[in-house]
Structure formats: C-alpha cells, structure tokens
Amino acid sequence: VLTAIMVACMTAMSVRPPSGASSPGTGPGDNQSMSDADIHFYFDPVCPFAWITSTWVRKVQAQRDYTVDWRFISLRIINSAVDYDRAFPAGYDAGHTAGLRLLRVAARARAQHGGDAVAALYAALGAAIFDQPNEPGHADGGYRGTRAFLEPILARAGLPAGLADALEDTGLDDELRRESAEALALTGKDVGTPIIQFRPPDGVAFFGPVISRVPTDEEAVPLWDNVVGLAAFPGFAELKRSLRERPQLRSFGAAAD
C-alpha cells in the first residue's frame, strides 16, 4: 500500500533508468517567467508528499524572510502516455485527473489574482484533502475534481466561486504542460512531485525532499538548512532510501496533533 502511495506522486518513467540530459528546447529557464522568489515549488495538489513538504516550507517561511513561488506540475500530464491500468494501482487515473482539474483552477486564480491566490488555494486544498479523515462515500479520488468539493474550499481561501468554472477549461492545459515540462527540465524526467528549485531561475533543483511527517516548528528551520546545504554543493545529485513510513496525515489514518 505504501508503495502505491509513493507511486501516486511519481511519473511512471521513474521505474526506468535516468534519462540524462534534458530534451532540446526544454532546458532550465527556457519556459520560466522572471521571479524574485527564494524558491520555486512545483506541486500537484493530490500528492500527499508534496503537501507534507509544502507545509514544512510554510513553517520555514513563518520563521524567516523567505519567499516561495508556488508553481504547477500535473501528474496526469506527465503520465499522459502511460497505461494507467498497468502502471498504477486502481483509482489513480481518477485521482490524477482530479489533480489536473484543480490545477486548472489554480492557473486561472494566478492569472486573475496573482501568486498569493495560488498560495491560499493550495493551502486550502491540502487542508481539505489531507488534514482531515476521508469522508464516507468520497474515497474515490475523482470527487476532488468536482464543483461540490471545490466551491467550499474557494470560499475558505477567500477566492471567487466563479473560479470553479476552470475545472472544465481544457484551454488551460497548454499552460500546465509548459510548466510541467519546465519542472522536469530542471531535474530529469524520472521523478514526480514535489520539485523545488533553489535561487531561481539559475539555481539547482531537486525532486523532494520527500518526508513522511511534518517537522515541528523547532525542527523546521534546522532541517531546511541541511537541505539547502546539500543543494549548495554542485556535485550533489541524490540521497534516497526506499524504506519509509506511511504519510502521517489524517487522510491516511494518522491521529490529529
């Protein structure tokens, strides 16, 4: 089950050897807009590990003068050529499709209300998806891509209910494809979410950090400094282990703090 959870945040290409150099025309910076943020954080709202890492990043923001540009990577788009029935456990097609629909709304929110709206929307989405037990009858991840699920979340985020119209707007998918390709051009194509770029637009980027629980306020900054230290070394590429605990989130059965 845990392997299936982790696969949910990955591209199916992650089972293959690393692809090496980026494809021509999609190198770092080719599609990036100018940003003065300290990091670019690429997320899909249905990935539990991206949510845990984003919560950690927000704790760091609260203790330091630290800016984040919340950007998009769609698990459904980066797996668009994949046979979901063979590559993923049952139900992940619906879940990833819901993530794509929610990212359309995030893209519309950014276009109309700016980056702060994306930050507020992602915070509200993650809290609704992961920080409370799953509602009976809503175990199907596809429910998260519906107006019934989204409209109360928009209200909690202080955003107009009309943004829910973007759920169906496939015209936004080109923007999401470009930004997903931008993220993978920074790391290689054998990863998933989250992807973090330090000191954009020219700084190094990595898939992760993948952690299974949110650090405490006291742990957040020292742990982050360790990650930044690794990222500062130009030869650093990967630090990984396959053994991990389930995400410590209420949606996965963890007790409330």
Task: Enumerate the language-model features and the residues they cover.
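Short, Lys/Arg-enriched N-terminal segments with co-localized hydrophobic residues
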Residues: 22-33
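C-terminal cap of thioredoxin/glutaredoxin-like
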Residues: 56-60, 135-257
